[in-house]
């Protein structure tokens, strides 16, 4: 779903814990003086975990002959009998046997764009868990389609451009009708990477009312925005969603995070069964370059929006062997090595996530889905040495069926300058934005990680996977890791604290979020909890540092890969725009679905250590922490 560093603030972030503050890079919109953070969607979601769901559905009648979509639909109808809604066309059954069905609430035939209901159905066809953010207030009695008393979509486009100071010229814009109710594409504009679009939708506001809005979509490179412009007053912008997730950090053989951990080595045929066409074919065409079914990698020194004709190393024999030296300068002198490294890391992470269940039906990034579900034609476009920025990286995640786009930058924090493609953790973090945005809320919805807390978790998941993958056989629970240290030329990395199980080294607790106002700060808290969880599972199940997990009945047999699998499964279970408590419950539910809750108490203890235990409560202004465990633990 939606992407995550919307706009880094130019001011230093507030950090009540006495520690050097993180420095956040500003993106295009913040440089234009627009604070996108102030336009984030409000958190509206509720989540009913498997225990609560079992109690609720006892009084409901379901037929054994119902398929999982029908069962889910009946639940939504019984929960909101007076509401209208539609089934989103992105339902699928995960590798853990859980069926995921997503619904969008409607009013007068128009979507309420931030009103979602997700239902998870177990292997026996029963409701496993569900979450929703459906609107419960009064629906406007007057159908806006009757009198058509709303603004012209062109005015909405111009309103979005003006309010956000977008680099889009819309003076000659004309709206062309497209498929869908009140859906338009704009002709005659310049400045956007693709033609802007507009859809008439309702939007839940913070005050509990509905606003009729034009959802204006503009892809301007570093920001791919959905701007909700009031349909009666085009100068009013209610909220903004950004598909682009930016990071603040930055590979060699899989498991080596950066050049300080080893040297480049030659690896033959590294793909797994997750890539049946290999990394250099999409099942129809074989490519003698860094292009295939999962990704297409190239340099992009100008920072432009086109990529097909950009430079890629060519090798008819598929031997991509290029020199690199830590003293080489500028980074463009080793662009062949850089592009190859980026292509390798991206594909390697694709294959790992596929083994965990991020496959075609779940909305992964592939051109050819091989009739396995989902929407194809959406490999990851990955740009090395992208000239549109420095000291950062980002990933844009549109809905399933449209390619993801990663931009990796050079870092000017060292002499010679460093190439972010050579720090695997940054590439993994960025690609993880694509993972979480496609899973949370369903592959067709890319706006479910746009609230402050859910957006923070989006950053945290990226850090977690980057850190989990770099673990070494010598590591113990006392091992600490930084994020982005090599690229930033700072051993402490780019986060406020090291990732550590030691509460003195990293004192972050659940209630720390009360004083944090930036997604990367909040993400560090969430990733810290997941780091504790991973080590708790390693202590319970042992660790393996092989590149590929070993499964038994679908369950990874070591704690490190089990943690990665459970965290990923939780993403698909939780509601749209979840909070920490709901995401914790979704991980517990993921363990119930996968192992019959074999790790229940281990998971509870890990979260309780950081104040997200039994009884912890979410409140946007005053979260309540708890170190307690539930009965039975």
Curated annotation (Swiss-Prot):
The UniProt record gives the binding positions of Zn(2+) as: 429, 433
- What species was this sequence derived from? Trichophyton tonsurans (Scalp ringworm fungus)
**EC id:** 3.4.24.-
Q: Which residues form the propeptide?
A: 19-246
GO CC aspect terms? extracellular region
* Residues carrying sugar: 410, 480, 622
Where does the UniProt annotation place the signal sequence?
1-18
* MF (Gene Ontology): metalloendopeptidase activity; zinc ion binding
What protein name applies here?
Answer: Extracellular metalloproteinase 3
Major site of localization recorded for this protein: secreted
